[in-house]
């Protein structure tokens, strides 16, 4: 399982990526595929530590309308494989992240979600992780909605 700090960092990175790519991507999608290796993961269902290698696919969009409304979107799909220790099980990792930010001046709405499936080959348990965050800030800068969820399951 990816640690909560890793997930929070990924969400922060997603927000920063949206902001940094905004000028270059006005009204366009920026797509990239990035290979990775040695990314730590943990199957908390059986305490396997896994070193995952694979590819991260990202798509970022940014647009504004004449009224000054800004919409940013970040989607990523991570696909990887690894071997768990101490079990020796082969794993397939699939993770999807989605972030949306809608804003006008201080007022904004943010939504982030992640679903990660760590699939063990053989008799070992699979892990599913889901996280969500929803934040709404009104024009006065007051947070009117702030919810988050974190759920794991083994099967």
Predicted regions: what they are:
Residues 2-12:
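Bacterial N-terminal signal peptides that target proteins for export
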Residues 10-21:
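Bacterial N-terminal signal peptides
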Residues 21-27:
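Sec/Tat signal peptide C-region and signal peptidase I cleavage site
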Residues 27-155:
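Beta-strand-enriched cores of mature, soluble protein domains
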